[in-house]
Structures are given as structure tokens and as C-alpha cells.
């Protein structure tokens, strides 16, 4: 006897199972089954396809008028941080620049100070709350970066917190050491600080899957970023890079040359970099909520990347300064509106390709897969990026069990 059948599904979203990320035109290929059925036993998918009465189960969910998809994958978050920076919104409205806010004690270094001052247990409680919000919105696989400690003690603290979260909730969670995220005030130079972070690589390896660096004007150069990435690979890490967010320094090209698993942001990437994606499996992780939140007009050139047969994914970039959202559904809407992605491209970019960007087996619904699913209160898959700003996730299913039920009942 099977454990659960979900039947009469209006639309069942079945992204293609693939060893490599979907590239170029492949991103627009999505198998959407009308009147679908999913059968689950022992936390795994037994059957997913057109409606059938050939299976029995101890529990049945009628998904008439609903959409069912793989659980979403958020491939770029800064989940563990102390404090918040809501007061900076009014300063920005007054015309204060980022550097002026930084000089006033705000900006990233204020988050560094808050993170350093927050105990590991308190940091865990805060990150747990934010993670549960993500789960309620349909995410069951997450990448979590450090980068607000900027010293040995606090970088380790952030990574330990994300590892504790993964263990407590048994999530598909990957952890990224982003020690070179900024340069702390106490550092004698960018170069000296980078060497401190490189020296930490062997110690943080037990807590982190990836090593990341912020390659940008005023932070770390192309040459410094390459040095760090090579040292990280020698220490056994797969590498990522925050690249070309503000200036076209060539971070995308570097990511491809160093065979990074992903390059993230890429708002200012050059045509040369986009062309190099053609022969690479490096995933371009685009973060349109960041551009939106910062009030900028120029978004990453998703269409140009796809036209060059590149692989792209979408993520929230959840952080306290430039993308204060842990709702990946909102990112889906912004991507459709501002990156000009089709609904099919959006869905693939937050499932199978996002999974490739963090090297996990997720984002598909195939026989033998973990039964990590979302039942959406929506008539079709195009509706979710169309109707933005609310939570469409009705039920979140992890390993075949309903762990979130957002159904709301009102009493007159």
C-alpha cells in the first residue's frame, strides 16, 4: 500500500531530469501534465504523470484546480545575520549614498557588527524564523552563506548555525564560506585580509561546501578573486563568485575559466562573458529582487545569456541590506516582468537549474526522487509569477509528509 496519492491535479509540473543545467532554449522546455497524479511511498515518488486509478494509498489529497510542482530551490541566500537595517530606507529616500550611509555607521559593516554581537543561539533563532518563512513559501532546498563575520570566530559561528538548521530540519541545504565578502575596518589592507580568509579555508571546510568571494570595485579585484578561488579549490572546495554586480570587471569570465559552479549577480557582465557561457556549465544565478530593492533600472541580461546558450537560475539573495525578501515567489514575478523570462523559464530556473547551481539532487519529480512537493493554490503554472506579492503555496510536502498547510478558514 502506498502512503499518499495526490490526484486530479490541474497542472503537474515536471521539470526535465538532467545531469547538467538546462541551457539556452532548453530552459523554456517544461513538461506540464493536465489532470495529473502523484503517488508516494516511503517518502519517495512512485509515480508522477497523467491521472490513473491503478494505485491505492492510505491517504489521498484531491488537488482539483491546483498546481503541483517540485519544492523550490533558493540557490543564493545570506540566511544567518544579526540585526536589521530598516532605518536605512529613509536615509536612501533623503538621497544619501551608500558611502555616506557607511560613514554614518550603516551598510554592510553595521550588519557585521550586529552579527558579531549576536550569540550563536540567538543567531540560530533568527535564522530559523527566516528559514521557516522560506519553507512556508515552498522552498525545501537552500544555500546559506557566511560573510557577515569577517573574522575566524564569527564566520565559523555563521556556518555552524546553518549546519544546525540543516540538521534540525533535515533539509537539502548547502553552506558557503563567504569570508571575503567585504573588508573589515580593522584590516590593514584588502590583500592582508584576503590572506587571512585563505588561511581559514582548511578549518571551515568541515562546515562549508563552497567558497565564495565578492569580486567588485573597492572590494576584491579579478586577480585577488582568482587567487582565492584557486586556493579554495586546492583546499577541496567547489567555488562560486559574486561577480559584475556594479562594474563589468570580468567576473563572469573568471568564473567560467575557474569552472565555478555558479557566478551570481551579473548585472554588469560583458558581452564577452555572456558569450563564454556557451561552452560552460557554470550557472548564472540572477538576483532580480536585489536590483528591484535597490531601485536600479538595469537588470541582468537574462535573454542575452540564454541567446548565448547559457544556463541561468534565480534566487532571492536574501540579506538585510539589498534584498530583504525570503519569498522566492516574488523573485519569480520580478524575473517574468523585468528579465523577460517565460513562465516555463521561470519554473526551471527555481527548480532544476537552481539545484544545479548548488550541486544537489532536487527540483524534479521522477520515480525514486524525494517526495518534496508544493501544492499551489493556483489554476495553472503561469498564474504564480503573474499574481505577485502573495503566498500561493497551499501545502508543502517533505519526504511525502505535509509539513505546511496554509489553508485559511474564516468564521463568519
Curated annotation (Swiss-Prot):
A GO molecular-function annotation: imidazolonepropionase activity
Residue numbers binding N-formimidoyl-L-glutamate: 148, 319, 321
UniProt-annotated location(s): Cytoplasm
InterPro entries: Amidohydro-rel, HutI, Metal-dep_hydrolase_composite, Metal_Hydrolase
A biological process term (GO) from this entry: L-histidine catabolic process to glutamate and formamide
GO cellular component, as recorded: cytoplasm
Top-rank lineage group of the source organism: Bacteria
Residues binding Fe(3+): 76, 78, 242, 317
Record text on cofactor binding: Binds 1 zinc or iron ion per subunit.
Binding site for Zn(2+): 76, 78, 242, 317
Keywords: Cytoplasm, Histidine metabolism, Hydrolase, Iron, Metal-binding, Zinc
Keyword Cytoplasm annotated: yes
Amino acids binding 4-imidazolone-5-propanoate: 85, 148, 181, 245, 322
EC assignment: 3.5.2.7
Cofactors demanded by this protein: Zn(2+); Fe(3+)
Top enzyme class: hydrolase
Pathway annotation: Amino-acid degradation; L-histidine degradation into L-glutamate; N-formimidoyl-L-glutamate from L-histidine: step 3/3
Catalytic activity: 4-imidazolone-5-propanoate + H2O = N-formimidoyl-L-glutamate
PANTHER family in the record: IMIDAZOLONEPROPIONASE (PTHR42752), IMIDAZOLONEPROPIONASE-RELATED (PTHR42752:SF1)
Job description of the protein: Catalyzes the hydrolytic cleavage of the carbon-nitrogen bond in imidazolone-5-propanoate to yield N-formimidoyl-L-glutamate. It is the third step in the universal histidine degradation pathway.
Family: Belongs to the metallo-dependent hydrolases superfamily. HutI family.
Protein name per the record: Imidazolonepropionase
Gene: hutI
Amino acid at each position: 500500500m502506498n502512503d499518499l496519492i495526490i490526484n486530479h491535479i490541474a497542472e503537474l509540473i515536471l521539470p526535465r531530469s538532467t545531469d547538467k543545467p538546462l541551457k539556452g532554449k532548453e530552459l523554456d522546455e517544461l513538461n506540464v501534465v493536465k489532470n495529473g497524479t502523484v503517488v508516494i511511498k516511503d517518502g519517495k515518488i512512485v509515480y508522477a504523470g497523467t491521472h490513473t486509478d491503478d494505485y491505492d494509498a492510505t491517504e489521498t489529497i484531491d488537488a482539483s484546480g491546483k498546481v503541483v510542482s517540485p519544492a523550490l530551490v533558493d540557490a543564493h541566500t545570506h540566511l544567518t545575520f544579526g540585526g536589521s537595517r530598516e532605518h536605512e530606507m529613509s536615509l536612501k529616500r533623503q538621497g544619501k549614498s551608500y558611502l555616506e550611509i557607511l560613514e554614518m555607521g550603516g551598510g554592510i559593516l553595521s550588519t557585521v557588527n550586529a552579527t558579531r554581537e549576536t550569540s550563536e543561539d540567538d543567531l540560530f533563532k533568527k535564522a530559523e524564523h527566516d528559514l521557516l518563512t522560506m519553507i512556508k513559501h515552498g522552498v525545501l532546498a537552500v544555500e546559506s552563506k557566511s560573510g557577515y563575520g569577517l573574522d575566524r570566530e564569527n564566520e565559523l559561528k555563521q556556518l555552524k548555525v546553518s549546519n544546525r538548521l540543516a540538521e534540525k530540519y533535515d533539509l537539502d541545504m548547502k553552506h558557503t564560506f563567504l569570508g571575503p565578502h567585504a573588508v573589515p575596518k580593522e584590516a590593514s589592507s584588502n590583500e592582508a585580509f584576503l590572506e587571512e580568509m585563505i588561511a581559514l579555508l582548511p578549518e571551515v571546510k568541515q562546515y562549508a561546501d563552497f567558497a565564495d568571494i565578492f569580486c567588485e570595485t573597492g572590494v576584491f579585484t579579478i586577480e585577488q578573486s582568482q587567487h582565492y578561488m584557486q586556493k579554495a579549490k586546492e583546499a577541496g572546495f567547489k567555488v562560486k563568485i559574486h561577480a559584475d554586480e556594479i562594474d563589468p570587471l570580468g567576473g563572469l569570465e573568471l568564473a567560467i575559466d575557474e569552472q565555478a559552479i555558479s557566478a551570481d549577480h551579473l548585472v554588469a557582465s560583458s558581452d564577452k562573458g555572456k558569450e563564454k557561457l556557451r561552452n560552460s556549465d557554470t550557472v548564472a544565478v540572477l538576483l532580480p529582487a536585489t536590483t528591484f530593492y535597490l531601485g536600479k533600472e538595469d537588470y541582468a541580461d537574462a535573454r542575452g545569456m540564454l541567446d548565448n546558450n547559457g544556463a541561468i537560475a534565480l534566487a532571492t539573495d536574501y540579506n538585510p541590506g539589498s534584498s530583504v525578501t525570503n519569498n522566492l515567489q516574488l523573485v519569480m514575478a520580478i524575473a517574468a516582468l523585468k528579465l523577460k523570462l517565460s513562465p516555463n523559464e521561470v519554473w526551471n530556473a527555481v527548480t532544476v537549474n537552481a539545484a544545479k547551481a548548488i550541486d544537489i539532487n532536487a527540483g524534479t519529480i521522477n520515480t525514486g526522487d524525494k517526495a518534496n512537493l508544493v501544492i499551489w493554490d493556483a489554476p495553472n503554472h503561469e498564474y504564480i509569477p503573474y499574481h505577485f506579492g502573495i503566498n500561493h503555496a497551499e501545502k508543502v510536502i517533505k519526504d511525502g509528509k505535509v509539513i505546511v498547510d496554509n489553508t485559511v478558514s474564516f468564521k463568519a
